[in-house]
Amino acid sequence: MKIAIVGGPTAVGKTDIMIEVCEEIGAEIISMDSRQIYRYMDIGTAKPTPEQRKRVPHHMIDILDPDEYYNAFLYRKDSLKAVEAILKRGKIPVYVGGTGLYADALVRGIFEGVPADENIRKELRELERREPGILRKMLEEFDPEAATRIHPNDLKRTIRALEVYMKTGRRISELQKETKGDDRFFIIVLTRERYDLYDRINRRVDRMIEMGLVDEVKRLLSMGYSKDLNSMKTIGYKEVIEYLEGKYDFEKMVHLIKRNTRHFARRQIIWFKRYENAIWYNLTFVSKEELKKTLKELIVKNFSV
């Protein structure tokens, strides 16, 4: 039995096509999106609509409040429980989403062997406060491979990698390779030509604004959720907050959301290219009906192995 992970960049069209595919093969969708797990954050995370969720059952959506902690280790554990429940119902589980870290957790396993050390973390945070950018330089020196995988702005993962090195004297990239992978999964990646994808991103952002993204952010702030929460730093929410603070005007806000989303999509594509055995489909050149037929056959065939 092989379970499909259908990944790809934001706005490529994963949700729409996979709802139709899963509806026709009797499958249930497990969201692989690190932002759709949060309640009240609907428009800016492009959650499936209530109508879509009625057509095909979805899992790992709306499971946490925006101020609750979550990570890839917990995602793997919780989503595999969903897999078990789906299998007991005689249905096919299919992962759909663009969070590469969650895909890694499933396919390559999670390295959790070194306990957290708050003293080291505090020391590293203080070092970064005194000299911004120093932790990135340290990571590039001590673990160049990890530095290529961790975004320069991802302070949390940078600190974790340095913490592991300081505690063990070993690189986290080496320890992660020793983590046992999981061969129950195979990866399908949906992509588009850049001009096509960027146009879809721009139009999606316009729709989010029309649907009330600004009001959604205002409501979250009025509920007491801090702008400093990890969830509130999501693209779309962060820019709206800064607009509400008067840092720039409405047009600049929209421009920044579009630009930052395009950059994010590019990083997602780079991430999924790391999976050597992934099966890629370019939606710019393949018809929807042809792709649906191919995906249905591929998912069912591998599930039946």
From Swiss-Prot:
Xref: Pfam families: IPPT
Gene Ontology BP annotations: tRNA modification
One GO molecular-function entry: tRNA dimethylallyltransferase activity
EC class name: transferase
Keywords attached to this entry: ATP-binding, Magnesium, Nucleotide-binding, Transferase, tRNA processing
SUPFAM superfamilies for this protein: P-loop containing nucleoside triphosphate hydrolases
Positions bound to substrate: 10-15
Region Interaction with substrate tRNA, annotated ranges: 33-36
Cofactor (UniProt): Mg(2+)
Site (Interaction with substrate tRNA): 99, 121
Catalysed reaction equations from the record: adenosine(37) in tRNA + dimethylallyl diphosphate = N(6)-dimethylallyladenosine(37) in tRNA + diphosphate
Binding sites annotated in the UniProt record for ATP: 8-15
Known EC number: 2.5.1.75
SUBUNIT field: Monomer.
Task performed by this protein: Catalyzes the transfer of a dimethylallyl group onto the adenine at position 37 in tRNAs that read codons beginning with uridine, leading to the formation of N6-(dimethylallyl)adenosine (i(6)A).
Similarity comment: Belongs to the IPP transferase family.
PANTHER family given in the database record: TRNA DIMETHYLALLYLTRANSFERASE
HAMAP family referenced in this protein's UniProt entry, alphabetically: IPP_trans
Protein name as annotated: tRNA dimethylallyltransferase
Native source species: Thermotoga sp. (strain RQ2)
Gene name as annotated: miaA
